Design a protein with these regions (language model features):
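Sec-dependent bacterial lipoprotein signal peptides
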Residues: 1-20
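Basic side chains
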Residues: 3-4, 24, 71, 304, ...
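Intrinsically disordered, low-complexity segments enriched in small/polar residues
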Residues: 9, 14, 46, 51, ...
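Bacterial Sec-dependent N-terminal signal peptides
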Residues: 16-58, 305
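C-terminal, surface-exposed recognition/capping segments
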Residues: 32, 39-41, 54, 74-78, ...
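A short glycine-rich, aromatic-capped structural motif
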Residues: 54-148, 173-174, 178-184
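Intrinsically disordered, low-complexity coil segments
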Residues: 63, 166-167
Length: 308
């Protein structure tokens, strides 16, 4: 069975698909599970990540819905056509992204917009696409199309089975720009629920805290964007933050064609949204975060998925 047929079949068999989401009113989950399904239900009493790599903590993305983040950034190996999540939240591939190609047997984690591997009608839709022409990434050749309706399979998480992420298509998705903006700006106490950090003295990025956050004992956290060193965690301290529900977006840099830059200096994460000929994204660097950024779609940015 081809990936395209499998994705279409999964979209039609709604009753048989697992759906897990955070329920905002009581912070529990609604779960529909087919018989003999091994994917765990959400347990709000437990934090960290479950067996398919979904955070047990919940994050509001509008006034009524919450989501659960994946355990790490999305990664891809072209030689085996395999998708996975980074083993650690602070992990990124770095300069090896310059080796991007259809035959590359290493891993990449910087992708052009909409490059799930589904033939969306764009000239560049494969994960290894490295064209530097922004219009090559327009879904069906139209700059206005995004990951909705008949084009939902352009979303990396919807179209692909992710090993150690449930290993089945249709379980994950990319946040919209509006959802990212809600996380950073519109949640209750939003300004206190994120901050820059350095992990193990070398990994720079932004920490996002869940709605119901309780700081672990003997650990300090300062919200805001006053430099990478505003929060410094050892690996042991970060493990405790992670177990309490914290999410970390590493400053993984960017790629243009085969040129990689700004590793550990900037983080740029695609959303599913468009703005005219641009793709919307969140961007951050030392002392600044912009959840309303836009950029040409040919650039390779990070992808962080949430459970559908």
């Amino acid at each position: 069975m081809t990936k395209k047929f499998l994705a279409l079949a999964l979209g039609a068999m709604l009753v048989g698909i697992l759906f897990v989401s955070c329920e905002k009113e009581n912070n529990t989950a609604n779960t529909i599970v087919e018989q003999n399904d091994s994917i765990p239900a959400h347990n709000p009493e437990t934090m960290g990540f479950d067996s398919i790599g979904a955070s047990m903590a919940c994050f509001s993305v509008d006034d009524f819905r919450q989501v659960r983040f994946s355990r790490g950034n999305l990664q891809y190996q072209a030689s085996t056509d395999t998708w996975r999540f980074a083993e650690h939240q602070y992990e990124c591939i770095g300069n090896a992204n310059a080796n991007i190609s259809a035959a590359y047997n290493g891993w990449i984690d910087l992708f052009g917009w909409g490059t799930s591997g589904w033939n969306s009608g764009a000239n560049a839709y494969q994960p290894w696409s490295s064209s530097i022409t922004a219009s090559d990434y327009y879904i069906a050749g139209d700059e206005n199309n995004s990951f909705t309706g008949s084009y939902v399979n352009a979303d990396w998480g919807v179209y692909n089975a992710i090993v150690q992420g449930g290993n089945r298509a249709g379980l994950w998705r990319t946040l919209t720009a509006e959802e990212w903006q809600y996380i950073f700006s519109h949640r209750d106490n939003a300004e206190q629920l994120y901050g820059f950090a350095t992990i193990d003295g070398k990994y720079h990025g932004v920490v996002i805290l869940p709605d119901n956050w309780a700081l672990p004992e003997n650990i300090c956290f300062t919200s805001g964007t006053q430099g990478w060193t505003i929060n410094q965690f050892s690996l042991e301290q970060w493990a405790r933050m992670e177990e309490a529900g914290a999410i970390f977006l590493p400053a993984a840099g960017l790629r243009n064609g085969n040129f990689v830059s700004k590793i550990n200096e900037e983080g740029l994460y695609w959303t599913s949204s468009t703005y005219y000929n641009f793709g919307k994204n969140i961007s951050f660097r030392e002392n600044m975060i912009n959840p309303r950024n836009v950029h040409e779609r040919n650039y390779g940015f990070s992808v962080r998925l949430v459970l559908r």
